Every structure is written in C-alpha cells, then in structure tokens.
Amino acid sequence: MIMTHCNRFIMLFALLLLSFTAAAHPIEEIETEATDTTILVDGVQVTAVKQGMVLRSEPIASTIVGERAVSRNQISALKNLAEMVPNLHIPDYGSRMTSSIYVRGLGARIDQPVMGMTIDNVPLMQKNAFDMELSDIERVEVLRGPQSTLYGRNTMGGVVNIYTLSPFHYEGARLQLGYSTGNTFRLRASFYEQFNDKWATSVSAYRTTSDGFFKNELTGADTDWEKSDGGRWKLLYRNNKGLRIENTLSFAETKQGGYPYAFLGGRSEGVTNADGYAVTPGQIAYNDSCRYERLTLSDGLTIQYETERYSLTSITSYQFTDDDMHLDNDFTPLDYFTLQQKIKEHVVTEDVIFRSKGDRRYHYLFGLYGFYRDQQMEAPVVFKPAGIDAMIFAAANQATGGRVQMHALANMPLDSEFDSPAYGFAAYHESSLRFGKFEAKAGVRIEHEQVSLDTHGSGTLKYALKVGAMPFPMEQEPVVLETESSYKQDFTEILPKLSLIYRFDENRNLYASFSRGFKAGGFNTQIYSDVLKEMLQAQAMGGAYEEKDIMSYDPEYSWNYELGGHFSCAEGAIRGDFALFMIDCRDQQLTVLADASATGRMMTNAGRTRSLGGEVAMQFKPWRALDIDLSYGYTEATFRHYIDGENDYRGNYVPFAPRHTLSAGLTWTIPTGVKWLGDVVLHGGMKGVGKIYWNEANTVSQPFYTTFNASVRLEHKNYSLDFWGENLSDTEADIFYFESIGNRFVQRGRPRVLGITLSINIQ
C-alpha cells in the first residue's frame, strides 16, 4: 500500500517537473495582473523578519492569502483559512477554546499546539486564544513543515504569520456589516490616518453576535450562541534613516455557549433522569450549562533598524489571557458531574534578530529569544449523588454481590488549583550561501525550557453504608482529602535544519530540505480530578491509592524530509507549488483517556509514527477575468510503534488527522462598464476533507466528504456587496467524535449558511 502511494507521488512529481520545461515554450501571451490569491501576492510585500523577501523563492512549502482573497472568501477566523491550505485541518467544534490544529498527520486536541501563530511578528503563546476574529488582514502566510529552527517551540508542523493592515499602506475609514444564518451579525469599523511621512496610526473595533445553529433538546435553548467584541490600536513611526517602530495594542472578549455534542449511544442509553427524561441517541440534551468566556489583552512592540548591509529587529510582547470554561461534563440529562476551568496567564516574550541584507553570496541571521509565563488555573469538578453512585460506587457494590451497598448523600466537590510558571530561552542561527543557481542553507537552534507545576487538591465525600440485612443505610464519617504535590520538567533541545534550492529563474525552483521539529512536554492537569476521585474512593473503601505516573508527558520530536518546488509557466498564467514529505515522529503526543472509567483527558506519548504525503497548490488564469485555484493534500500518518498496555496499534492510522484535503475555486470577474457599480464577481468553490479516524483502533471514522460554497459580489473601489453561501449542499458530516464514561458523542458540521456582507471604504 505504501509503495503504491509512493509511486503515485513519484509520478506526480515527474509531471510537475514538466511544467519547468513548458515555461521555455509559452503559449499565447495572456495579459495578467498581480493578484493576491492563495499563491502569490504583490511583489512589493515583505514577509516576516525571519524569512526571505519572497516566500516562493525560499525552500519552504507555503500558502499566501492576500487581502482580496480574505475578503472574497469571507475569512473571519483561522479555521476558515485552513480550508484553503493543503494538508491543514482545523475542525470547528466545541468552542473557541478548542483550537485543535492538524497538519501533515501531526496535531493534538489539548495542550501544546503543533503549529505556531504570530500576529504582526508577535508570537501567540496561549493556544486557547488561537481562534479569534480576524479583521483588516493584509495577508496571511502559512508555512508548512518544521519551523523550529527560527520559531522555536511548538512549530514542528509549521507557523501561521498574520499581518494586519498598516496605516502607511492605507488611509481612510472602513465599515463592514454582515448578516447570515443563525441570526449571526457582524460589525467592523476602522480608521487609518497618516499624519506625515513619519507617523501613522489606526484604530479598529468589531462586534459579533450569533444565536448559533444547534439547540439543547432538553432545555430548548441555543447551545452555540456567541457574543464577541474586540479592538486594536496601532501606532507607527519611521524615518529616513532606517528606523521603524510599531506598537500594537489589542483586546478581545468572547462569551459563548458551544459544545453541541450529540449523544450517540453507550451505557447511559435509555436511562432517565429525576424528571423522567430519557437519554436518547442523536440528541443534544444536557441539564447543566456549557459555556466559555475569554478576555485577552496583548501589546506588541517592534523596533527595527535597517541599513544597506544589515537589519536589527527587536520584538517585545506582553500577553494576558483570562478564560473560564463551564461544562456539563457528562453531556447528558443525568445529574452526574460538572467541570469548571479558569486560567489566568501572563506572558512576556522577547526576540532579537540580526540579519544581513543586500545582494551578496553569503547571508546570515542570528537570533536570541526568551519568554516567561506565569499561569494560575482552577479546575473544580463537582460529582453529584447520581454520578457518584453510577461512576464510583456501582462497581464496588456489584463486586460484593449486594452484601455491601454504598450510596452518596451529597455532592462531592473536587477542587484543583495549579500554579505553573515556565520560562525558556534560545539562541539560533542561519547561514545561506549562493553558488551559481544553487543556494544552500544551514541553521541551528539551541533551546532550553523549564516548566513547573504546583498542585493543591481537596475533596469531601459524604456517603452512607448498608451491610447485609441492615434495615437502612447508616451515614458514615465523611472522607476528607487534602493533598499537594510539585513537579518540574526541563528540556534542552538542539534543532538543526539543512536545505538546498536550485533556481531556474526567479519564478521556478526545486528544493530539498531536512529539519528537526520539537513540541514541548507538559503536565496533565485535566486528569487531576480523576486522581483526587480515586484517592477519595480508596479511603472510603479502606484501601490504599496506587499512584500512577500520569501527571506529565514528554516532548514530541520529528525528523522532516521534504522535496518540493515552485513553478510558473505560460507567461504566469499557471503558477503553483508542490511538496513531497516524510516525517519520522518520535514520542508523538496523543490525547487519550487514562482508562475506561476516567472522566478527564490526558496526553500520552506514542512510541513512533510516520507521515508520508504530498501536496500541490495551483492557480490558473486562462484570461484576465478568470481565476481557477486548486489545492490538494494527501497524508498517510500511521503508527510504527504504539502499545497502550493492552493493544498494539502498529500500522493503524493516527486519529483526527485527515488523509485527504481538497479545495477548488473558480472566480469570474465581469466588468459592468457602469462607473458607480464596478465589477460583478462570481465565485464557486468546493472543499473536501477525510477520511478521518476517531480512535487509535481505527474502528470509528468519518469518510471523505465535500461542501460547496458560492458568492455573487458587487465590487467597487469604495464598496463591495456580497451575497454568499456555505455548505450549499447541506452536507451532514461528523467533525468531532469522542468517548467518555462509556458513552459516545459527536458534533455535526454546520448546516447550510446564507449571508450578506456590505463593506464600505472611505478614502
């Protein structure tokens, strides 16, 4: 099977190589214009301070989405962008807290992300804040493959660089109003002003409200409602001596429901609650509230000094996150247990980059990076009497054959408090040497990180005991638990990379690269309530708690081998990128249940996985008015060695990572000839993803499925009016699946969505 796929990739690679030859014999010249599609943006744009001037001439698999493409495709969040990028999958489930990212077979549901994210060169350190509203975006760069040498921790799958609009590039005011299915309303407003050739500023704000798409059938309430507000203030300075200063202050507040998980079946099926409501497959029905609230505040200061020979850049940031999650953690009408998780986090980062400039054979880059994080978390879990009897006492009562019966008398609160400071620092370097049409690059990063965890747990269990022929249960002395513990982990990593690129010309090249990726280890705070529960249970039954080594997990490593290229032919009418890759991943981090009775998730390390795959992104412009975009990614990510203590999963597919991603779009621009009307832009597209396995045993899966979208846009330099639709085929698909306390749950994808968006530019 693997050899068959490899042969297909070799054939694809050979066909793509022919495009380089075809460029020597172009077809009839076609008038083209520089467009900001997913392949190419205006050549004057400058990429991140750590990359080259033009990403398509670098040995990197990348996708660039410009301002016009962001607007035309209604991209308002990172998960919308992922649908345009091959081998990138960001499912929209749970709430904005669940920012799970999967790329090239790598990814995880909780804790450390596999991809990094920067906004105006400032790294986002809290994964919970990745899913945010994107407004006034100038362009987005998605770099795939390990970027650990330049970007460090948690970028082994790549990095997403987002750049917001600069008041030096645009002056005026913007207003956007949108309404769509689900009673979803969006309002955005911004103002850009350049005072003189040195100073400029911008202010922007947004508000989003939505009733959502799913209802709780028990209460009749909307489950995935949302209210979000935010704003950004940028102040820029530049002089004619090479100095540039940019400060960006931003905040965002989100309040939402979320977690529309439907019960599929399991041990609770048919069980009725105190009101006689039965747990029924296919229903979203839970009795306690599920909601999420988040407040973020960040300030990023970039100071850059440039000469003809070098540039020196300092990027300093402060980030504050305060979020609060509430869950009916059994997701049923039964009174079992609830969870709250509150996180307050302060982060300070500093990155200093010194790099050479100019047209020279040898270039260099040196960097120093450091961060400090102070995080406090509270995670109280409350087990209710019905939940205690069903989840804790049931097995013990059954084991005695009914001779001894234990029953809960009151709620059992399990309070967990965590203090988790962390710090890290790194030094990195990259050298490049050009000889003829070849350019070789070599880089290395030395990174050290230390993370600590201090825990405090407490709980109280009140119960009654009935033995034999006793006429009634007797209340027992409450079991009281108070415990503290401390953990610490240190990581010191050396992250090298090598690449060689051959440039046929400025638009066509081939490259080969080799690099090491790294994802930090950490602590399993979500499983801590299970530890407390088992401690209380052991005390109540007169036994001893057997401590398990489950509170921490190790870093994840990968060796990445990649062969790819960028091409352009037929006078620029055909442009594209392609890559073949193999990723040998060691200690891959997987989200699992500790055992069948566990209520929380934990991260564990699989022995070894391997990802083989390829991806291609192309743009065709047969004539000026027509654009055709196509991207496809294939990944075969399998376990090479993973035994969970009972089962050997060798050869099985890694769960949650799709095997195929597909995106295709056609845009036709029709000039109306009416000055005040502008152009009519017709767009149609298709997106596909799958097959996705939901567990390590590969017994549950979502087949490959497609959704269709379309829009009609009136586009003028001063305004645009969009009539758009997503999932027009109303495709039903599962986007998330999980099992908990013997039950199975799923979240379906959104139904058909229709909307209208009005944008106004006043210049």
Where are these regions (language model features)?
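Short acidic/polar hinge/loop motifs at secondary-structure boundaries
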Residues: 120-146
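Gram-negative outer-membrane beta-barrel transporters
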Residues: 365, 437, 573-585, 602-695, ...
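Outer-membrane beta-barrel translocator/receptor signature
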Residues: 99, 126, 135-138, 149-217, ...
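Periplasmic-side early beta-strands and strand-to-turn transitions of outer-membrane beta-barrels
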Residues: 169-170, 178, 190-288, 321-335, ...
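Extracytoplasmic beta-strand/coil segments of soluble accessory domains associated
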Residues: 62, 79-122, 138
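Membrane-embedded beta-barrel scaffold of Gram-negative outer-membrane proteins
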Residues: 302-327, 509-515, 526, 532-605, ...
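C-terminal beta-signal and adjacent terminal beta-strands/loops
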Residues: 687-695, 713-763
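Solvent-exposed loop segments that connect transmembrane elements
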Residues: 215-221, 259-285, 330-337, 380-415, ...
